[in-house]
Amino acid sequence: MKELKILLILVVVVLVGYWGIEPYAHSVMHGEVKKPDYNYSDLKITAATTGDPAKGKELFVANCASCHGLKNDGINPGMDKNAAIASFNVVPPDLSNIAAIVDHKFLAAFIKNPQQATENPKFAMPPMAQLSDEDVGHIIAYLSSVAKKNLDGKEITIEACGRCHSIKYQKIYAETPAENLKAYLGKVPPDLSVMGKAKELEYLETFINNPQNGLPGTSMPRLGLTKESTEKVVAYLDQIADPHREQRNKLGMWVIGYLVVMVGLTFAWKKKIWKNIH
């Protein structure tokens, strides 16, 4: 009986340490994580977010296609990849699915002033001052009409992060060469293979929504992803960081069950052996 009391005391001490001390230490070391703002309420958006797709295509070809392609509609960028890298130190994204993953209010603000929307004064794309608010609405309507629907987490991650970040464990490599990324951002962006284990999921959601809230001073621009897109990216990073978690958890339950049975048998055996002595 004495041994059982000692075991119970140890269990209580461990549980208090795990559920009491550890969360407190984490809160002291990491502080409060800001909640994501999917309304992008800091942006004063005057541009339209709807319009005529046909007019939008004309405006896209005239104003965007020199740097950006649109594979979904057979439009190739006027500038090839190597020329773009030489000019901007980063590959301009294909915009086929941008309207499916980025909030349309953010997208409108981004087209008008990329530096302000991304909170990155060094962002390579210039403001589109020649476009009226109505023009922006037409472009967004066009982008929405060609975008693929219901992209999964992997697809969104590649769309949103693949120009700068590699995920080598999944054989996904950044479109932009490392030396150019270093020149553009100041350092090579980290590989995302195990980011889902290295960082808490709540932190990742906040960081993706607005990098400055998670890491003030970072050179990563704000992406403007919708809540759904962000959650899919975080879920994907979590899944690939520990792809065997479900199998391990199932096995773990069997191991715990086995240990419980063995503890019970050991205790019963001990009582039987020592009952005449005690």
Where do the language-model regions lie?
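Hydrophobic secretory-pathway targeting helix
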Residues: 1-47, 64, 106
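Detector for the c-type heme attachment site
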Residues: 67-74, 100, 112, 144-145, ...
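C-terminal single-pass membrane-anchor helix
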Residues: 1, 238-278
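Extracytoplasmic/periplasmic/luminal assembly and interaction segments
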Residues: 53-100
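Axial heme c-ligation environment in periplasmic c-type cytochrome domains
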Residues: 21-27, 88-100, 110-136, 146-149, ...
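Short glycine/threonine-rich turn/loop motifs
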Residues: 71-90, 162-193, 248
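The canonical Cys-X-X-Cys-His
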Residues: 56, 60-71, 107, 139, ...
